[in-house]
Each structure stands twice: as C-alpha cells, then as structure tokens.
Swiss-Prot record:
Higher taxonomy: Bacteria, Bacillati, Cyanobacteriota, Cyanophyceae, Synechococcales
Keywords from the UniProt entry: Membrane, NAD, NADP, Plastoquinone, Quinone, Thylakoid, Translocase, Transmembrane, Transmembrane helix, Transport
Stretches that traverse the bilayer: 10-30, 48-68
Record-given protein name: NAD(P)H-quinone oxidoreductase subunit L
Quaternary structure, from the entry: NDH-1 can be composed of about 15 different subunits; different subcomplexes with different compositions have been identified which probably have different functions.
GO CC aspect terms: plasma membrane-derived thylakoid membrane
Chief location of this protein within or outside the cell: membrane
Organism expressing this protein natively: Prochlorococcus marinus (strain MIT 9211)
Length: 84
C-alpha cells in the first residue's frame, strides 16, 4: 500500500513537472523564436493570436509590466515626448 502511494505520488509529481516545464519553458521559447522569424511578415489575425498566446504562456508578463518603469534616460525622454 505504501509503495503504491509513493509510486502514484512520484507519477503525479513527474506529470506536474513535465507540464510545468512545457508551460514555463518550451512553449514560451517556441513563441519567442516564432515571433522573431515571422515579425515582419505576420498578418493581423496571426499577430492577434500570437499576442493572446504570449499573455497565456508568459504568466509573469502581466505582473512585471505593471511594476516596470524604465530607468534609462532615453526611455524617460521618449515617454516625455509621447505625453506632449
């Protein structure tokens, strides 16, 4: 009974590990390289779908964007120009 529980626990942990690795590493890297290859040739529908996938598979992106403030002088200058 205990060995069956340990075996099932390892199987579940392994499945979570594989799914997490796919979700956090493999699919985001694929999307990144796909966007680099297709950036200048995408149509509107493909771009819309890729943006949706980016927000789905980059879970930290929403969190980081809400707190990110550029610290470079060129970024502040561009923001100041855009606000006028």
């Amino acid at each position: 009974m205990a060995s069956q529980f340990a075996s099932n626990s390892l199987l579940v942990l392994g499945a979570y590990g594989i799914i997490g690795f796919l979700y956090l590493v493999v699919i985001p890297l694929f999307l990144y390289f796909w966007m680099n290859i297709r950036w200048n040739f995408m149509n509107k529908f493909e771009r819309l779908c890729l943006y949706g996938l980016v927000f789905l598979f980059f879970p930290w992106f929403d969190f980081i964007c809400s707190f990110f403030k550029p610290k470079n002088s060129w970024a502040r200058r561009d923001l100041a120009i855009d606000s006028h």
